[in-house]
A protein has these predicted regions:
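C-terminal accessory/regulatory regions appended to core domains
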Residues: 1-171
Length: 171
């Protein structure tokens, strides 16, 4: 439970400053220098705990991973939550349209169109995060998992937009 590691309530909105503060305290206490004189088992346990802290931090900093952790903690399901939106035909069509639009923008090398597209994707992501939070608050776990899958796609799309942006500005 990443929330328990940092002694935080299980919630979608996490106080990032408090998270960073607690991370630094935990990392300091688990630093290898503190275990120089310890036996091999204690060193291994400290290393393992340090890895758990790093993994928990990664989970709590990423809204998709954080939401998936909340869903898993509340449903007891720890299997991969991906592939939930593949039955959403409307979203599948939207994915195809977005990918085609990005491809056309790259081919035309239209920087203004790319900027506009990036803003629309960012807006869609923000709206979907708000909807995800509402589903989590209402304990609608299957729907929340679908939003996680959609957000994962939008994150990949944003990465692709950045790559296209880099290629366009290299010219």
């Amino acid at each position: 439970n990443p929330f328990a590691i940092f002694d935080l309530p299980i919630a979608f909105n996490v106080d990032q400053a408090l998270l960073s503060e607690r991370y630094l305290v935990l990392q300091k206490s688990l630093h290898p220098d503190n275990f120089v004189t310890a036996d091999a088992q204690e060193q291994r346990i400290a290393m393992q705990k340090s890895t758990e802290v790093n993994d928990a931090l990664k989970t709590l900093k990423d809204p998709i991973l954080r939401a998936e952790a909340i869903i898993a903690l509340n449903t007891g399901k720890t299997e991969d939550l991906e592939q939930k939106s593949t039955q959403d035909v409307t979203f599948l069509m939207q994915q195809l349209e977005w990918r085609e639009e990005l491809e056309n923008i790259e081919q035309s090398q239209d920087e203004n169109a790319l900027e506009s597209f990036a803003k629309r994707v960012k807006k869609e992501t923000k709206e979907m995060l708000t909807a995800l939070e509402a589903q989590l608050n209402e304990q609608q776990w299957p729907t929340a998992a679908q939003f996680c899958d959609k957000l994962r796609f939008l994150k990949k799309l944003a990465d692709e937009i950045s790559q296209v942006e880099e290629r366009l500005f290299e010219l």
